[in-house]
């Protein structure tokens, strides 16, 4: 319960003035933070193919069994994924890997024990989309835009650590990758690289899963420059 002070006019309380003037307190404008990201047309990029790149696990059950075995040895799995954005007609599109007709994923994967997140993502991006002619792709990892946790050896993941979970089984970090103005990507033959517009991803967990469908919200804080 708050108590109001006595009548200020009778007790010497300053009335609507700063008793220190501007000598010690400076009036500052609100701080505005704006991140600018350059986007280039999809037609600026060339897409080739290379040998198939297969998953480590043959089934979902095998994936969780391996995760369980590795958790006992090295602890929580660390995963990183890259968000690559282009534009078509000034509409942002996210590059996704498509396997089959209904499965979509961001490029990335598991980090090795003790591996740096940024360097690990660069390694994984090169393995998945890197050129075959020996020219090194310069991946510019710009910003971490999301964190997701898997509390158990099961499919559900959350953008927070659920209550009473002290040992998550996997931590996934999403990084925005700033693409160069032009580039060549080599896509494994068993995948298709598709450009999905943000309006298609938005609120579309049934089609793309909870993580990819959350990208429009995660990316809304950026100011896109359409080159």
UniProtKB/Swiss-Prot annotation:
Query: Alphabetically, which GO biological process terms does the record hold?
Result: cell differentiation; co-transcriptional mRNA 3'-end processing, cleavage and polyadenylation pathway; mRNA 3'-end processing; mRNA alternative polyadenylation; mRNA processing; positive regulation of pro-B cell differentiation; positive regulation of stem cell differentiation; post-transcriptional regulation of gene expression
Short sequence motif named Nudix box, residue ranges: 109-130
SUPFAM superfamilies reported in the protein's UniProt record: Nudix
The protein's superkingdom reads Eukaryota
Q: Where in the cell is it found?
A: Nucleus; Cytoplasm
- GO cellular component terms listed in the entry, alphabetical order: cytoplasm; mRNA cleavage factor complex; nucleus; paraspeckles
* A Pfam family this chain is assigned to: NUDIX_2
What keywords are annotated for this sequence in UniProt?
Cytoplasm, Differentiation, mRNA processing, Nucleus, RNA-binding
**Which intervals hold domain Nudix hydrolase?**
76-201
Name under which the protein is recorded: Cleavage and polyadenylation specificity factor subunit 5
Species name: Xenopus laevis
Q: Which gene encodes it?
A: nudt21
């Amino acid at each position: 319960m708050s108590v109001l002070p006595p009548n200020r006019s009778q007790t010497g309380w300053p009335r609507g003035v700063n008793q220190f003037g501007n000598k010690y307190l400076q009036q500052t404008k609100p701080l505005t933070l704006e991140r600018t990201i350059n986007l280039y047309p999809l037609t600026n990029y060339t897409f080739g193919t290379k040998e198939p790149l297969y998953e480590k696990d043959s089934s979902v059950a095998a994936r969780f069994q391996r995760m369980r075995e590795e958790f006992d040895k090295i602890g929580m799995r660390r995963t990183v994924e890259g968000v690559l954005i282009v534009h078509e007609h000034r509409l942002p599109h996210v590059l996704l890997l498509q396997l089959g007709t209904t499965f979509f994923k961001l490029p990335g994967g598991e980090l090795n024990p003790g591996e740096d997140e940024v360097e690990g993502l660069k390694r994984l991006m090169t393995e998945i989309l890197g050129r075959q002619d020996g020219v090194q792709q310069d991946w510019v990892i710009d910003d971490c835009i999301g964190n997701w946790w898997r509390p158990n050896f099961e499919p559900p993941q959350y953008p927070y650590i659920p209550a009473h979970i002290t040992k998550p089984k996997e931590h996934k970090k999403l990084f925005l990758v700033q693409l160069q103005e032009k580039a060549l990507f080599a896509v494994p033959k068993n995948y298709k690289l598709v450009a999905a517009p943000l309006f298609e991803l938005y609120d579309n967990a049934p089609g793309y899963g909870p993580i990819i469908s959350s990208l429009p919200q995660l990316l809304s804080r950026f100011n896109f420059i359409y080159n």
